[in-house]
Amino acid sequence: MKITINQASEFVGKEVTIGAWLANKRSSGKIAFLQLRDGTGFMQGVVVKAEVGDDIFATAKALTQETSLYVTGTINEDTRSPFGYEMAVSSVEVISESHDYPITPKEHGTEFLMDHRHLWLRSNRQHAIMKIRNEIIRASYEFFNKEGFLKIDPPILTGSAPEGTTELFHTKYFEEDAFLSQSGQLYMEAAAMAFGKVFSFGPTFRAEKSKTRRHLIEFWMIEPEMAFYKLEDSLQVQENYVAFLVKAVLDNCRLELDRLGRDVSHLEKMVAPFPRITYTEAIERLHELGFDDIVWGDDFGAPHETAIADSFEKPVFITHYPKAIKPFYMPEDPENDQVVLCADMIAPEGYGEIIGGSERIHDLETLQARMEDFDLDQEAYSWYLDLARYGSVPHSGFGLGLERTVAWISGTEHVRETIPFPRLLNRLYP
């Protein structure tokens, strides 16, 4: 019977066949240990010469790294194994040999590994990170479905940029100009006026010339929008959502976290509610910490976010940023017209902003005035202005960056490892 490695617990004491790749191998004169990988997990296969005979043992000893094969044998429990089970191999059938596999068990530099990203994905570490990424995606759908959100797919090609920025990828759309989407937010606002609570999950593209460990050119975002939600309502959704993601990974990816050496004691503290401070309070805190380079009205850089987050064990919301450094669609605070009703969620341990969100302006005249302040072409946004013309309501939304969230929860230093094929400032291959 053919099974996968993650089914091994169901077949203890039985003879089965597994299709796999050889991740690694070690052998002595009379026994060979095969580390097998099939995409669902890893398992050790033990080949004993006295039990399988000379021919099968010779085949096993000659196997090269990443050769694909069928292995047949009996599944046994093994508490010494990191996988919990191993196979007593009775036969080996080679499917396709692998010659001179470039990523050997020795250490390799990052650029070399990125050049071979299509092969690096096969490694134990990358397998663990991708499993955690998948769990975060799965749990996101579970959370929003349970909360009554409708999944909406906004366009990737757009005729305008939601934040009025120049950091756009331009392309031709037949005879018109088009851009790769930086965010589906404006379209999600339209969907919220139709369906109440909606969310999207898809790629976004930002032509930022950044080389930091937090930035990708192409990344994925979860973007919910909620009609009749004020800022505090949205913050409660955000903290419950992030706490739900962390718990899902702790519950379902413990082996992967262990494999990555992640200290889960940090993650086990991620229970809502999360602390909140205003932008002004954050500036004061930074001055107390010796950051004299920043003044009220400046945006935060990575060192500032890290210093603020270090004061808390959980993610922290920074709310009420200056109006001048935030996008046009954010409403002023009724009690202070110099700040807007918004918040960024800053992850602990130096991982920076993982969520940005705000209330949205729903008054037509106010929205038009803000667009004039930003020198935006109102004709290009006429459809968006229609939302305020025809029965708009107070509403809020946010965007969670998937790769930064994966990096934080998995303890991965650089976001380039949190997406299968990263697009960086200097990398469009493979």
Curated annotation (Swiss-Prot):
**GO CC entries:** cytoplasm
Q: Please provide the record's keywords in A-Z order.
A: Aminoacyl-tRNA synthetase, ATP-binding, Cytoplasm, Ligase, Nucleotide-binding, Protein biosynthesis
Set out the biological process GO terms recorded for this chain's protein: asparaginyl-tRNA aminoacylation
What organism, scientifically named, is this protein from?
Listeria monocytogenes serovar 1/2a (strain ATCC BAA-679 / EGD-e)
Q: Which residues form a coiled coil?
A: none
- EC numbers, comma separated: 6.1.1.22
What PROSITE patterns does its record include? AA_TRNA_LIGASE_II
* Chain's gene name: asnS
Q: Which HAMAP family match?
A: Asn_tRNA_synth
Alphabetized Pfam families for the sequence: tRNA-synt_2, tRNA_anti-codon
**Protein name as catalogued:** Asparagine--tRNA ligase
A GO molecular function assigned to this protein is: nucleic acid binding
User: PANTHER family under this entry?
Assistant: ASPARAGINE--TRNA LIGASE, MITOCHONDRIAL-RELATED, ASPARTYL/LYSYL-TRNA SYNTHETASE
Q: Where in the cell is it found?
A: Cytoplasm
Which family does this protein fall into?
Answer: Belongs to the class-II aminoacyl-tRNA synthetase family.
Membrane-spanning residues: none
Q: What reaction does this catalyse?
A: tRNA(Asn) + L-asparagine + ATP = L-asparaginyl-tRNA(Asn) + AMP + diphosphate + H(+)
NCBIfam families in the cross-refs: asnS (TIGR00457), PRK03932.1 (NF003037), PRK05159.1 (NF003483)
User: How does the record describe its quaternary structure?
Assistant: Homodimer.
Tell me if Nucleotide-binding is a UniProt keyword of this record.
yes
> Which EC class, in a word?
ligase
